[in-house]
C-alpha cells in the first residue's frame, strides 16, 4: 500500500504506526528530491552500515556509477583498525577524491541520504574536501 509523503508524516507524528524502515525511506526520498547529479556535478551518495561505510559518485542523467570506494578497500584497512571509525571515513574520503580527480571530476553534490551530517558522514565529507573535491 502506497502512501503520500504527507500521510506518512502524519502517521509518524500522530499515531507512531510508521515502521522505522518506511520512515527512513521517506527521509531519504525527501533529501534526494532536492539533490540531482548532472554531468558537470555528479552526486556523491553515502551508505553507512554498522561496520563499514560506502560511497559512490553517480551521474543521474545516465544512471551510472563513476567512482566507488568503501572502508573495505585494502589501503584503508591497512591504515585503520576497523571501518567504524571517523579516521577510516576520512581516509576513504581522501581516496575517493583522488580517484575522482583522476577521472576529471572536481565538483560534486553531496547526498548524505537519511543520515545526519555528523560523525562518520561528516568525516567522509571533510576527507573528500581535503582531497580536492568541491561541494
UniProtKB/Swiss-Prot annotation:
Provide the protein's localization. Plastid, Chloroplast
The answer on whether this UniProt entry bears the keyword Plastid reads yes
Name the cystine pairs. none
One GO biological process this protein is involved in is:
translation
| Keyword Isomerase listed | no
GO cellular component annotations of the record: chloroplast; ribonucleoprotein complex; ribosome
Alphabetical list of Pfam families matching this protein? Ribosomal_L18p (PF00861)
InterPro entries, A to Z? Ribosomal_uL18_bac-type, Ribosomal_uL18_bac/euk
- Protein keywords: Chloroplast, Plastid, Ribonucleoprotein, Ribosomal protein, RNA-binding, rRNA-binding
Question: What molecular function does GO assign, one term?
Answer: 5S rRNA binding
Q: How does it assemble?
A: Part of the 50S ribosomal subunit; contacts the 5S rRNA.
Sum up the protein's function in the record's words. Answer: Binds 5S rRNA, forms part of the central protuberance of the 50S subunit.
Would you identify the family this protein belongs to, as annotated? Belongs to the universal ribosomal protein uL18 family.
From the Swiss-Prot or TrEMBL record, give the protein name. Answer: Large ribosomal subunit protein uL18c
Q: Which organism is it from?
A: Thalassiosira pseudonana (Marine diatom)
Which gene is this protein's source? rpl18
